[in-house]
């Protein structure tokens, strides 16, 4: 049995993407917003994904645009906070990604005990955006 099959309990897992709303420090962060609003939106999305039957969940800062090759400390701190707030509600294998920053992704995943990740780490900076 492969590592992925043992983690997800299926040979072809469906991994749902939980895109966090813009975080503090992001250009698109809502004026007058709060991290608790980001947490509440993430909880709603998490519930919908798990209810929908996904085999795993990847939590990302997809809306931290424009993407940077080095994620800011405020983004990492905010992601860690939001993931901590979601941790008791996660019932499927889950991972995290700090978009386009492999080092920050590994640091974040180690800090929050993520079970897997996806990241750009090999020096190829190509994408669809």
Which residues fall in each region the model found?
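Generic hydrophobic/aromatic pocket-lining and core-packing "Φ" positions
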Residues: 46, 83, 105-106
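Non-catalytic positions within long, well-ordered alpha-helices that form the structural scaffold/packing
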Residues: 47-50, 109-110
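Conserved anion-binding
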Residues: 20-23, 104, 108-129
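Hydrophobic faces of well-ordered beta-strands that scaffold small-molecule active sites
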Residues: 14-18, 57-59, 94-97, 117-119
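Glycine-rich, proline-tolerant flexible connector loops at the mouths of alpha/beta enzymes
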Residues: 50-78, 123-129
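Ligand-binding beta-strand-loop-alpha-helix segment within the catalytic cores
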Residues: 86-87, 93-96, 100, 108-110, ...
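Active-site mouth loops of central-metabolism enzymes
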Residues: 19-44, 94-101
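Alpha-helix-loop-beta-strand connector modules within alpha/beta enzyme cores
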Residues: 10-11, 16-17, 68-96
């Amino acid at each position: 049995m492969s590592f992925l099959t043992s983690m997800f309990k299926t040979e072809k897992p469906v991994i749902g993407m939980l895109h966090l709303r813009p975080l503090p420090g992001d250009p698109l962060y809502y004026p007058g917003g709060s991290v608790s609003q980001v947490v509440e939106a993430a909880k709603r999305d998490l519930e919908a994904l798990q209810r929908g039957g996904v085999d795993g969940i990847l939590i990302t800062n997809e809306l931290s645009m424009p993407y940077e090759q080095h994620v800011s400390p405020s983004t990492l701190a905010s992601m860690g906070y939001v993931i901590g707030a979601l941790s008791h509600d996660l019932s499927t294998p889950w991972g995290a990604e700090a978009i386009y920053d492999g080092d920050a992704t590994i640091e974040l995943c180690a800090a929050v005990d993520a079970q897997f990740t996806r990241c750009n780490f090999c020096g190829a900076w190509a994408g669809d955006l």
